Amino acid sequence: DDVESRGLGDVYKRQSMDILISSNLERLLFDLSGENDAEVRGYMEALAAQGRYQVSDKIRAGLDAAFWAGSCGEEDTAATIGRYYREYGYLIDTHTAVAANVMEQYRAATGDTAPTVFVSTASPYKFCDSVLKAIGEAPAGDGVELLDQLHAVTGTAVPRRLAALRGKQRRFDLSCEKQAMD
């Protein structure tokens, strides 16, 4: 939301959500800067050194003309998952919930009622703990146990590849910071 509303880019703290280090965003900034590679490189260097950057007025104007932005925190994400499940009988993942919530914000702000399609790229089963809590269930267990619990509560099918994890031994216990991944 900061990129759109104030022209700022900040490193996002949530895992898998650091969209500021993205070749797609770099390409967008490159296009909006008039293909000024030095300017875009400066933004990426500022992001690496200071954790943020502020785009030029020219880029800001291009962003304002092309995009509408909103934000959706964890509480609103959970509320959206729960509401979609209760009202529509449809189980959505955390990423889709953010999209749905921001779409609703957009409609409220603009009056636009055009039909909308969400392309969900994640499964609710990838986020069992969060999804269970969002639909009012206390997660019981971890790993495959949560897959089974979400299935038992909702009747939705566990994705085949996740179901195939039953009985498998954990192969890796290593983790590292993303900056250490060379």
What does each model-found stretch correspond to?
Residues 2-8, 12:
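Single conserved hydrophobic/aromatic residue that forms the stacking wall/gate
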Residues 16, 21-33, 37-40:
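C-terminal amphipathic alpha-helical segment
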Residues 19-27, 72-79, 94-98, 122, ...:
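Conserved active-site and cofactor/substrate-binding residues in soluble primary-metabolism enzymes
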Residues 1, 24, 28-31, 99-106:
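Buried hydrophobic packing segments
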Residues 34-113, 177:
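Active-site-adjacent helical/loop segments in soluble small-molecule enzymes
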Residues 1, 14-21, 67-71, 89-92, ...:
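Hydrophobic alpha-helical scaffolding
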Residues 98-182:
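C-terminal non-catalytic interaction/assembly regions of soluble proteins
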Residues 13-14, 103:
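Glycine-rich, charged/polar anion/phosphate-binding loops
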